[in-house]
């Protein structure tokens, strides 16, 4: 059982390689929301 678990854990990173481009972009999403606040406030005149 332990050998199977270790083998499964070794294969998981390779299984998720298709998601690598999305994972590279994910940290930028909060920055886009932060910039969106300024765009929103500029559109309403910084009330």
Swiss-Prot record:
Q: Keywords of this protein's UniProt record, alphabetized?
A: Membrane, Photosynthesis, Photosystem II, Reaction center, Thylakoid, Transmembrane, Transmembrane helix
Q: Which residues cross the membrane?
A: 20-40
Cellular compartments annotated: Cellular thylakoid membrane
Point out the propeptide residues: 1-10
Q: Name one GO biological process term.
A: photosynthesis
Specify the protein's topology with respect to the membrane.
Single-pass membrane protein
A GO cellular component annotation in the UniProt record: plasma membrane-derived thylakoid membrane
Where is it chiefly localized?
membrane
Pfam families for the chain:
PsbK
Stated role:
One of the components of the core complex of photosystem II (PSII). PSII is a light-driven water:plastoquinone oxidoreductase that uses light energy to abstract electrons from H(2)O, generating O(2) and a proton gradient subsequently used for ATP formation. It consists of a core antenna complex that captures photons, and an electron transfer chain that converts photonic excitation into a charge separation.
Subunit structure as annotated in this protein's UniProt entry: PSII is composed of 1 copy each of membrane proteins PsbA, PsbB, PsbC, PsbD, PsbE, PsbF, PsbH, PsbI, PsbJ, PsbK, PsbL, PsbM, PsbT, PsbX, PsbY, Psb30/Ycf12, peripheral proteins PsbO, CyanoQ (PsbQ), PsbU, PsbV and a large number of cofactors. It forms dimeric complexes.
Q: Which family does it belong to?
A: Belongs to the PsbK family.
Q: What is this protein called?
A: Photosystem II reaction center protein K
Question: What organism, scientifically named, is this protein from?
Answer: Prochlorococcus marinus (strain MIT 9313)
State which gene encodes it: psbK
């Amino acid at each position: 059982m332990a050998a199977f678990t270790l083998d499964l854990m070794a294969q998981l990173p390779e299984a998720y390689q298709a998601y690598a481009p999305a994972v590279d972009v994910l940290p930028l999403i909060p920055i886009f929301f932060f910039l969106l606040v300024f765009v929103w406030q500029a559109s309403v005149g910084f009330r």
